[in-house]
Structures are given as structure tokens and as C-alpha cells.
């Protein structure tokens, strides 16, 4: 594949190689896809009323923890999950940092962050009025992860996280979040059987330290 790319694009030799995506899942497994996110992904929508929720406000001193029911089957999330949150502003802005984890093992799976003023996406801030309700259309960073059968997922909603700065004016006050069916987590799922030809193994380079003299 790499030689074909080199010959066609750099030496103008041969036919144009097929463009494929090589994606590594969080457990180390590799799979080939024509596009990524995969075109055949099916969306699983979960209202937050289906989660066990602790907390109702996100600020510098309060957070919300959500835990799903157990997944009966192994579940492969491949793409950009979305989290649409119904919130009540308590200030003229504010932000939410959402972290997704495997609730059974504590393994971090991904995150997303959004400023309430950019609740519909894009680059233009919108006016936010205290005590009015809005929908934050959050999107997680790209994820290709597996949830083993019998595990559940957790969503932690905090005011900030990683290397993000707190909201400059509204962090202490925060905002209220409806953990009801009005707030929805959507997961892009794909099904790849163990014998699917799109799975492949990467040959690891030999360790020079173990090479015979």
C-alpha cells in the first residue's frame, strides 16, 4: 500500500492506490475503513433519564456524574459522539467539560467541551440570558473505543478539565443541567465480527536489544 502511494504520487507510476483509513481502537485492535467515521455507523440515542445521576449543577464547586445501564453486548463506538444538554443559564455564559469513561474500570474514553455562548457550534458567540433555558449541542472528540459486555459508561460533567481554562465570568455560578429525556447522549456504533476481513494485525518492529549478535 505504501509502495503504491510512493510510486503513484511521487514517481507517477502505476494506478492510483485505493484510499483507506487505518484506525486503531483503544484496546489496540486495528481495522480498515473506506471512510472514518464509518458510513455504516448506527446511532444509539440515550436520554439522560436512562442514567443514574448525581448532581444537577455544573460549576467550580459542583459537578454531575451520570452512569448508564450495563451494556449486554460488546459495543464498538466509532466516530464523534454527541451530547445535547438542556441547561438553564445562571450567568451570561459558562462552559461544560464532559468526560466519558468506562464506569466499570475507570478507563477514560474521551471528552468534549463547550462554552454556552457557542451552544449551536460555529465561531459566533450568542447572547446568553440568565435564567433562560438553552440546548448545548456538544460533540466529543473523535473516539474509536470498545465497551466490553457487562460494562457501563459514565459521563462526568465539570466546569473545566484537562488544560482548558475556567469560564472567565461564570465558573463560580455555573449552570443547571436537566438530567431528563430532554438531554440526549448519541453514540455512533459499528459492528465488526471477529472474522471480518477489515481487522488486521500490525507487525511490530524487532527490538534491536533482542537481536542476536
Model region roles, listed by residue range:
Residues 1-5:
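Extracytoplasmic/secreted proteins, especially bacterial periplasmic and envelope-associated proteins
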Residues 7-213:
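Glycine/threonine-rich phosphate-binding loop and adjacent beta-strand/alpha-helix elements that clamp
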